[in-house]
């Protein structure tokens, strides 16, 4: 119960500032972000959480002040908006309704609330938001070393490894100018002669950039800006600077550029070739002085550039660095740049400039060497202890001109050397020494999925061979998106605990600019993983600002005919079912609804409803009598066959069920949004698809769907396609197949969620327990027994390519919703009301989870002890929960030691409690 004690302690610390009987607004957000620097909406939504020492606390009214300065806000002068007292319990997504907001302007706000007893709170702490500029305000000029026309880079998105040979690849490389893919440094001196109040930087460096002011890095991002389809959207980043970032007199802006996904043409391994142009920079800085004057420094023809010491950089192939090409102090004043060249004005990317509102990728963890083996003299293989996405940091000592090559990989060959055959080769990092003591280097523009590092022709630690350089130190940097974690889970079952860890290490490894399939071979945003793992992702990570960016990418990638491609951004067109598979494309329909359910925010439904309709309409054009027959089906379903296309279940059954689900959710969205005509259209369409599906795939005599596979029977139950009178019979067929298979699954990437949740939602959690509580394949336990630290692409790692895939991680939903019992209420989105209904299965003695909802922390922690079932729960202020207890109807139930008034759910056959906010201990006799 240690985790729950920590939760209680954190909650207690938060409310110590609140006196008895009071309530306090905390964690103020604008457009779901704390103090955002680039709000696009001119009527942004304001939200806050609430804390209180007392139970059953709620809000009955609020008052918001928005001011043009912190000074005015301190004086309670809401010169931009004074909402007055508004009587409502709503504390999320309050639409700003004050004076028109100005672009490139910062505003400050605070709120106070009244509780259920009519007592008013103290003012919250101040929060702020800055309105983004229009693209016309930015008036961007793009600069670099070479124009796109002079680069001779290939156009198009069909060049990939399956269709490419080395000669064709080399012909493209030879035809292009080497400067078009070279990392460059750009610098711009400027003067500051007055006292600076603040400065705001708007920057986009494509593919990726590193920004310095006077030699000091600005921000902590890696691989900024985040990936987009640069023909449709180009992200820019915003930074606030203060007077301490400048010095009186001469100052210098420095920018380092790399290729990223913007320009993947390169030697060595690459999954595909795509080039939107050579590296390019847009920069604008607005400096405000204390005297009220302003100054603009922006990218133009006065900037200079030079080749950087990064002599090779490829998002797929690695990175090389020659320290002898360093130019010390190039980003600071006093540097002589007479040998630098003037930049050229470049053709602007085609995409619309948009502020990056999703969180950046950063270095989140660092790992030391776990073990090292010297396979032969001066030939070392290092185990870093964790498979991850990232890059190494090396410290070396040697003579000028000596070089070190760092190979990385997920696994090892039989002889103990690194194995890149499955994950894309060759991939490595080269560093050439300048011979100046101990030198430290960290790559900047390339990452890979790896656990093992191989380095040849070196001394390690001690300089035994004077002719070789010495590796002094080695570390692994784990990079992933900085969105932050939203939940935690643990239980008495060690297989489940380690499974949770495996899955989350894989999620983190693939949580980059987009959710990728793997961090080495492809690094592509295959869509199905997001929606099929959606609830598990939501419970574990804060995706409030990430998913809107995902939907923008989906919108950008949607074709004119309505097709949503399987990969987003669609850097490469693989064609056929790998471009057009309904289970992947329907993500554009499912995600806005899932976002609404978890965050209580309908903005994605409102904004992307046309996208949803257009995709369902597209599937209608692909159907015959409402049956859709194309796609990948239940990809990688399990059996004796080779993994790939669905073999156990009809592809048409899979495609048509997702066509139905898309129409069904589009109808629900239309109803919510008050679009009556659309609701009637898609409600009718969903009904017709359902009828056609049952006519085509259901056998009324055997009560089986399709091939009677686990996928075939679970999908219609999950989606409520099966007619009610047949549901139990279909369930029995499903259970019979599971039993026949020895309580093992046969579903794949698509089917796992439907199988798991069909069992969980229909009282078969014991079956789920047996299905996963073992060390055999198919099963998570087999990968644990195999000694892996991340989830793999196939249940048997020896058969798959990637050892860092989260596509099979759908059990996370079961951990949180069933074992811990935290379940949302679709009728009260955002967990305004929710259920806590833990399932006690197998020989488990405890389970616990917490989830940071938009209203605050939700926690559930149960244990079986001394003949009692003890459940501890935390319910956020301004919410309510229904507790469903896994005990008999006549069990004695106490809350905090006192006998409780208990209801009973005939449907679930469980005693129930209705509770308001607070922390409670519930005891039941077993």
Regions found by a protein language model. Give the residues of each.
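Bacterial Sec-dependent N-terminal signal peptides
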Residues: 1-25
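Alpha-helix capping and helix-loop boundary segments enriched in small/acidic/polar residues
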Residues: 174-181, 218, 226-230, 241-243, ...
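Non-catalytic C-terminal accessory modules of carbohydrate-active enzymes
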Residues: 273, 277-286, 297-330, 334, ...
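Alpha-helical support elements that line or immediately flank enzyme active sites
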Residues: 199-203, 213, 391-410, 453-458, ...
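Active-site acid/base region of carbohydrate-active enzymes
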Residues: 208, 300-307, 460-502, 508, ...
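C-terminal capping/lid segments that line or modulate ligand- or cofactor-binding pockets
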Residues: 253, 321-322, 522, 540, ...
